[in-house]
Each structure stands twice: as C-alpha cells, then as structure tokens.
Amino acid sequence: MNTYSPKDVFEQSRVAQLEQLPVTLYETPQAGALAVARHIADEIRDRQAKGQKFVVSLAPGRSTSDVYAELVRMYREEGLSFKNVEFFDLYEYYPLADDRLGNHAQLSRQLLDLVDIPKENIHNIPGNMPKEDILSFCREYEWQIAQAGGIDFQLLGIGRCGNIAFNQPGSSFISSTRLVVLDNNSREDAKIMFGSVDQVPVSAVTMGIDTILQAREVMIIAWGEHKSGIVRRAVEGEYNVSCPASALQHHKHTAVLLDISAAAALTRMATPWVVRSCEWDDRLIRRAVVWLCRQTDKPILKLTNKDYNDYGLSELITRFESAYNCNIKVFNDLQHTITGWPGGKPNADDTNRPERAVPFPKDILIFSPHPDDDVISMGGTFARLIKQGHNVHVAYETSGCIAVCDDEVIRFLDFVRGYADLGLLQGGDAYRKYEEYMHFLKDEKIGDQDTREILDLKALIRRGEATAACRYMGLETDHIHFLNLPFYETGSIHKAPLGDADISIVRKILEEIRPHEMFVAGDLADPHGTHRVCWEAVLAAISQLRETDAWQEWLSECRIWMYRGAWQEWDIDQIEMAVPISPEELRFKRNTILKHQSQMESAPFMGNDERLFWQRAEDRNHATAEIYARLGLANYEAIEAFVRYKME
C-alpha cells in the first residue's frame, strides 16, 4: 500500500486513524508548494469572478518560499492578478533597527513587491513603532482584520517547538495580536536572518492563536525530516498549550501539507503495522524488528513469538513461521552491513560485504558540500580509505565563505600585517589592504553584505583549513579539489538556483577521475539546503553522462554511498554500510575536525545544537554503535553509517 496516497477512503481512514488533523502528503517539497500555490491562485480567481476580495495572511520563511515563487511565476506567465487580494502580516520582529530585515521585508522580496497587489491593501506590522503605541496598534490591527471581513486564508509554517507565528509553547489558545518576548529557540531560529543571536530582536508583535483560528481556512505546511517530530506532536498529540499548533485540531477547515520527510514520524510512516496490514520488504522487516527490540528492551536473537504477537507483528510470524527465523534473517542482514573495508577487501569473498573486492585499489571521489562535511561526517572512513591504499580524491563543492565570522578574517589580517612588519613582505600593498579591510569590517552593519574581496579571504581561510585536515590524514594536495560552485557565491544565505555552470563543474571532475566509488552528502531533508543542492548537482551531472554511450560502462560499475552531516544519522533500517571506528581512530577524527578552527565556537551557522561539530560527530557515532550493540551485535566504540544510492 502507498502510505502517502491511499487508494480509497477506507485505506485513508485506516492509515490516518491516529491523526487529529487532515494530512496530505507529497513526494517532494516542490510538489507540495505547487499544490499550495495553485490552491491560493484558484481562490483568488474564484473571488475575482464574484467581484470579492480575498483576504490572506502568509508566513515567511524557507518552507513557503517555493509557494511564493510559483505565485510570482503565475502572475508573470499566466496573468494571475493580485488586485483583489488584501494582505495582513502574520508577525513582525520588534524592535527592528533596519527595515531591510524582518518578516515584512522578506515577504516583500519574495512576493509582495513582485506582483500587482495594491499598496493600500497591504497591512504590515511596523517593527519600529514607539513602545507606547504597541498596545493600541494591536487593538487597531484586530479591528482592521474585522473591517476586512476576516481572514479568508491563513498560511502557516510550524516551529520546532510547535509554535505557529510567534505563539510559543504556553501561549493561550484565546490570545489575540500582542507583543511577545521571544524565547531562546525562536531567537536561535532567526539568527540566520540577523547574522547572530545577539542581533535578533528580543520580542515580536504576532497574531494570536485565536486570531489565527478565526481564519476561514488554515493551511499549515512543513518540509524536511527536521520537522517530523513536531509534526507528529501537532497531528497525533494532545490538544495542549505545550504545542501551540495543536490548537488547529479544533479548527474546522485546517489542512496539513507535508512532504515524505516531514511525515516520517507519523504512525502511518514510522510504524505502519500499528494501523494496517503491510506489504513487507526487507527494509520494513528490519525496521519492525528493531522497533520491537526497543519496545521489549531485548536484543534481536532473544525476541520470542509472544513478543511479536503482543506488539502487533504476528504477520511476521506467519511469514517466517517462527520468531527464530525472522530474528536470524534480520540479525544477519545487520551483521552484513558491518565492514572495516569501506573500499572493499582485496582477495576476499565479497558476497555478503557492502563493497566489492575488485578493483583494488579503487579510484574514490568524496564530495563534500562544505569544506568540513567530509571529516565531520565520514572522517574515520576517509582516513581508512587512504590507509588501505585507495586512490582517494576529495571535491569541496562550495567555498563555505559565508560561514566564517569577521573575527577570523581580522586574525589573519593581523598575521599578514605582522608578517609585513617583520620585513618579510615587500611593498606597501599589505598595509593599504589591511587598512581598507579593517575599515570595512569595523563599519559593517547588520544586513550589509561582505565585499567580494572579504568573501574571498573567508573562502581562503576555509580552503587552508580543509587542506590542513587532508594533509593530516595523509592525502596528497593534488588530490584536493575546490570546485567553488557558482550557485553558492551570492554573499548571503540566499543562494542562486542550481545552474548549468554548477553542473558542468561537477561533470568535469567526474570525467577527470572516473571513480569506482563515490561518497556524497545525503542530507536531503532540507529543500533549500546547500547539501541538497550539491547532491542535485551530482545527480544532474551523472544524468548528462548517462546520455552518452561512452560513459554507460563506467556508471554501471560506479557505486555511490550517501553519508549524513552533523545534524542527524541514518535510521538503522536504512543503513547498508557501517564502518566501525576504534577509540584511537575516533581521536584521530576529532583532531582532523579541529583543523577547521573557524568552525569552532565562533562559527555563524552552528544551528540549534550548542555542541561543537566534533562533539556532535562523536556523539552520533557513539549512538550508532550503541544501537548495534543493543541489538546484540558487536560492541564498537563508534560507527559511521552509509546508505547506497542505486542508479536506475
């Protein structure tokens, strides 16, 4: 059964029996965004035909950006007019020191300034109003919404704690537009827009939950695996102020639109045997048995017929005739994922090994989206491939320049000036450039973009760190490739679309090396993340090569392994190659990561996790090894995990 597109009402009722909100699933974020945009366009046109206004409130952010891009396309190419649309801000940061920042500025760039919505139809929340005017403004804003006839359509995202707009956990379900103090999580989430947590305003003016609930139609969207946990709480959890989005369970016309990754934790996806009969394949069987081990706190080989029957897995007993047979199958499957030879073991039977024994040594290419993803995600495997004699190359796809703070640049500028002071650098350019760059960095304001020269300096810092890390592992410097894909080089967090120039660069490195084995970042959860775009560049390059007969043989022999980044790990049912790491190798991996000094405490994009990258990597690798041990397999210090990408 297709769990995200049930074939009839009966199947839908079965798979959704624990869901308190109506859910529609899409295979990709782009498909979901297209559906939302079409729905909004249909409503606009329907109201236009009736001579009516369409009153909307829209959420900003990366989740909704594709929706707005499609609406703009419809406006430009299909004649969709927004003249009958009346718009209300959902929230705004307060106080805003720069009107180029904030929610309304972002929405203006994404949609409002690009279509023909009349300026008088746009109701914004000023981020710079006097404090004494806030209370009266909030009352006036509610009155303006009422005068417009109420909100017809409300588009929402969902925060990692279940917040809708800036209604944070604990917010009253009868709250109206008001000033709220932002919690640490909300400020952490906003630091990408403002540059750092310290620059994020301490408060915001937001529509209240009751204001949102009064909208005639509410649509909440979420894309990406990082949203899956909170989506489950909102959809299947209790109606409770600890999860503000759960308030929508009592709204008559709410729809939840998710991609497969965001829906991953819903019962219908995570443990489908709880709500229906399953079409069992090897991966689902492994997932069910691992889940059963967690429920019973037993290793695989100690599970009994009673355990399977008590937890709703009697279908597996029927299929395998006994718990013993099922246990042995899953245990062996997991055992065969473990290998100390990620490039293949020469002169060995590779029937049950993840990677082939021949050819040996292999030409291996590691793609790293940023200059440190390789060592963070697979540093132990990287070092072992080199040690075992393979011809290893690494390709750093982007410069990573925007992830270097200004203090790092100043530190290197001071070094260059000191070098010149020692008389080791001839000419006056060093002093002149030092003063020029220092003046710029000193006067730079929030929202200002770095100059191209400053960005080049930041890229140079990261290039030096990556080279040092590779040298530490024993990789020859002529095997290090910096691709500097153009889509990344915008100077801001907003990247350009993947283009032909990016794909051409990736294709060239593939043609040059012709690897037998590739490692790529498989973090596909974020539809706009650099990792995903880099992966799409690799896929596009491969697709072009597959169209030429000369490359068919190479592609048929090339194996692609996906690793995950600093944020998450593959689920146990997905893992196809598990590379054990000894305590000594783990310390070596830590030292390799530490070569990336600019990405330690001062890195701008550490995410919501306070641990340093080497700590996250070690904790993740320890956790994977612990899972294997609890399932009854060998107890290793740490494990790096990979999933094979199979080309159709």
Residue map of PLM features:
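N-terminal glycine-/serine-/threonine-rich phosphate-binding loop
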Residues: M1-V55, D349-T351, V358
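Conserved phosphate- and dinucleotide-binding cores of soluble alpha/beta proteins
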Residues: N2, F10, Q20, E27, ...
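Glycine-rich N-terminal segment of FAD-binding domains in flavoprotein oxidoreductases
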Residues: D46-E77
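Structural motif
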Residues: V55, E86, D152-F153, E217, ...
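Short, glycine-rich nucleotide/cofactor-binding loops
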Residues: G61, I366-V375
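Histidine-anchored nucleotide/phosphate-binding helix
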Residues: V67-E78, D374-S399, A403
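Short Gly/Thr/Asp-enriched flexible loops that form oxyanion-binding sites at enzyme active sites
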Residues: V67-R73, I164-S176, H528-Q544
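Metal-dependent de-N-acetylase/amidase catalytic core
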Residues: R187-G195, Q199-A204, T296-L365, R384-Q388, ...
